Amino acid sequence: TSLHQQLKALYAGDEGEQEVKLGRYRIDAVRDDLLIEEQHGGLSALRDKVRSLRRRHDVLIVKPIVARRRLIKLDREGGAEVSRRWSPKRGAATDLFDELVHFTRAFPHKRVAIESPLVEVEELRYPGHGKRRRWRENDFVVEDQRLVRVVKTVELRSRDELGSLVAGD
């Protein structure tokens, strides 16, 4: 999605590189000596990769959380805008805990940090079924997600910072 590409460019910066091959892995971005892996899905998918990379490198995991989403309905794929509205669902920094439960073998670790940008996105969707098995009335396919802005960024490097997140500091 555009969101993935935009965040990758943001974290790589002007001096960094994107899509770097390192051994058997492809790294989303490398800035100085820092390896940056962006993950929209579950963190457990990165667990073994991070455990391997952290032996020789510092690793930053970027796990975006959608704080706010504007839904833009199109009449068809690549078509004209029909309507737009805000989704009632909102994400929060504490949503990260659901993912960390499956990531304990990789984090916390002195060479691993997690950054979770809370982002506002525009999601373009059109009528259709996509690859889902179940049909529903008013089904839609997500065409793209675009970054509007980063609202806030939460950084975790240690167990203590996890505690601060729970306490709301």
Description of each model-found segment:
Residues 1-26, 102:
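Acidic-basic catalytic patches of nuclease active cores, encompassing PD-(D/E)XK
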Residues 157-169:
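C-terminal, charge/polar-rich interaction regions
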Residues 27-42, 46, 53:
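Conserved catalytic cores of phosphodiester-cleaving nucleases, focusing on short active-site segments
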Residues 42-58, 89-104:
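Short, charged, amphipathic alpha-helix that recurs within catalytic cores of restriction-modification
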Residues 72-75:
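Short aromatic-enriched loop/helix-cap "lid" or pocket-rim segments at secondary-structure transitions
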Residues 64-69:
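Short beta-alpha junction loops
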Residues 81-160:
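Long, low-complexity, charged/polar intrinsically disordered regions in eukaryotic proteins
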